[in-house]
A protein has these predicted regions:
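Anionic-ligand binding patches
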Residues: 1-120
């Protein structure tokens, strides 16, 4: 999870993580990207998106966080880190549309709030 990336990387790191998977035949994985929004006194609204892929046998690429270096999205042969080096927009698309979901929701929320305040 996002808030624990640095801690996980420091405690375990890519190479120890991949070592745990060295004999694993099922290397399927899911990358989930979530955003949450919460106003005081209200219930949080969560937006998520992502995709499926596989865990590589070795770390590849130089950009991104630890998981970017071994996660290969379905339909690709390169890790997210390698894709980012070549085409940032393509790499970003594999994170899903959680940010877009949030933006649409927030924009609509603000429009509704404005209209209700001014009785449109």
């Amino acid at each position: 999870p996002g808030p624990y990336n640095h801690y996980f990387d420091k405690q375990i790191g890519i190479y120890k993580f991949l070592e745990l998977f060295k004999n694993e035949k099922n290397r399927k994985a899911r990358l989930e990207h979530c955003f949450a929004f919460c106003e005081p006194g209200k219930k949080a609204v969560v937006f998520s998106g992502g995709g499926t892929g596989t865990i590589a046998y070795e770390a590849r690429g130089n950009l991104g966080r630890w998981h970017d270096k071994f996660y290969i999205p379905d339909g690709e042969t390169k890790t997210l880190s390698e894709l980012r080096e070549i085409d940032y927009e393509k790499e970003a698309s594999y994170w899903g549309d959680a940010k877009d979901q949030f933006a649409r929701w927030y924009k609509n929320k603000k429009e509704v709030s404005f209209k209700s305040k001014f009785h449109f």
